[in-house]
């Protein structure tokens, strides 16, 4: 998870063998894929990469494109994800006989995703897999994709700048800012326990207010007054800190004069 231009796609291309590395090594299941001295060819890594821009072959039908990965690698039927189930989950049954130029960008992206999944690789790399999917359909696809990945048990790395998507799909979440991995943790901790102001500002999921530590369990803010609670870690008395307040932390007090109307509620994982 990180902003555009930070190098997320380059990381995937490097793992897939499409870019060379300068230092270190890339290992998968104890096997060195890349190092300064050696590099296994991309087609021999059993790593599947779905690009952000669809990479469908224009002279093949969508069905042929999807099955190409499995046929190319000579996978047995029982090693692959069920074709019919995958087509149904991604809602692309009506475009199987069409060619890439006859379908929408969102349909092409889903077809590319199906092709990556069908061969059941050791490692699946998804670059902004749902960026071209219509917003009204995206949540449904996210839910289905999560189910597919869970059932297939394929290790998957997903690149996205959508924090909701990252938190919903991922069992772990890495935040990359300024070419550095700023935080790597489960989604709950990344969201509720961000480790820096940089991460908070990037996620944009709350408000930071300045405060002074006045006791082991209290802060003082000039506008809010005294704030009490249990700190995650101890701070010296008199320390200047920033308190993160997120929407979920706020509760309406029935004795308050504040009046409001709930317009919409949406569950996001």
Regions found by a protein language model. Give the residues of each.
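Walker A (P-loop) phosphate-binding loop of ABC-type ATPase nucleotide-binding domains
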Residues: 3-6
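Conserved coupling/switch loops of ABC nucleotide-binding domains, chiefly the family-specific signature
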Residues: 22-25, 178
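Helix-to-loop junction immediately C-terminal to a conserved catalytic motif
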Residues: 16
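ABC ATPase NBD Q-loop/coupling interface
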Residues: 25-45
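ABC ATPase nucleotide-binding domain helices that frame the ATP-binding cleft
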Residues: 9-12, 111
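ABC ATPase nucleotide-binding domain signature
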Residues: 37, 51-55, 60, 130, ...
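Glycine/charge-rich catalytic "coupling/switch" loops of P-loop NTPases
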Residues: 223-266
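ABC ATPase nucleotide-binding domains
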Residues: 46-48, 61-198
